[in-house]
């Protein structure tokens, strides 16, 4: 973020509120969620670049986000229109099997939100689980579309 001084910074509004109103959380440490130097930048000189995302947002033509929940309060899905159809990626599903088997990730806040996100992701022809090493097999040379 600091390397791109002209970029807008899009953050889940739900996640932002959760971050600022939760004092103890079993797997979201404040300093690991948003390191102090980044937080200072976000609420300081970069605040005018921060966009707090509603549950459904269109960022630009062909680029949308939706709140997916499941993993944590800041989890979102990003949809990108490509020549091969819509691609969706999210941290609510780590590997493809999470989506295909409707099996929530191991560290989840709400398994029902995960299952809802899986069902919605399955509507897209291209699913990109963020942490799946098989993405390199699915997408030759790392090219999605």
Task: Describe the residue ranges of each PLM region.
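Cap/insert and terminal regions of metallo-dependent hydrolase folds
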Residues: 75-145
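Residues that flank catalytic or metal-binding motifs in active/ligand-binding sites
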Residues: 5, 46, 74
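Well-ordered beta-strand positions
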Residues: 58, 69, 79-81
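Active-site glycine- and acidic-residue-rich loops that bind
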Residues: 64-76
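A generic "binding-loop/recognition-motif" signal
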Residues: 15, 72, 133
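Active-site metal-binding motif and surrounding structural segment of the metallo-beta-lactamase
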Residues: 1-11
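Metallo-beta-lactamase
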Residues: 10-67, 109-125
């Amino acid at each position: 973020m600091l390397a791109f001084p002209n970029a807008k910074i899009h953050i889940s509004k739900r996640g932002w509120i959760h971050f600022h109103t939760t004092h103890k959380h079993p797997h979201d440490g404040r300093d690991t969620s948003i390191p102090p130097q980044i937080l200072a930048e976000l609420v300081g000189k970069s605040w005018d670049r921060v966009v707090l995302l509603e549950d459904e947002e269109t960022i630009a033509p062909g680029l949308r986000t939706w709140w997916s929940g499941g993993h944590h309060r800041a989890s979102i899905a990003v949809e990108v229109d490509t020549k091969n159809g819509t691609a969706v990626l999210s941290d609510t599903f780590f590997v493809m099997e999470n989506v295909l088997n409707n099996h929530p990730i191991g560290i989840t806040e709400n398994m029902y939100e995960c299952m809802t996100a899986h069902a919605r992701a399955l509507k897209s022809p291209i699913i990109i689980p963020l942490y799946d090493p098989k993405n390199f097999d699915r997408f030759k040379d790392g090219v999605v579309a």
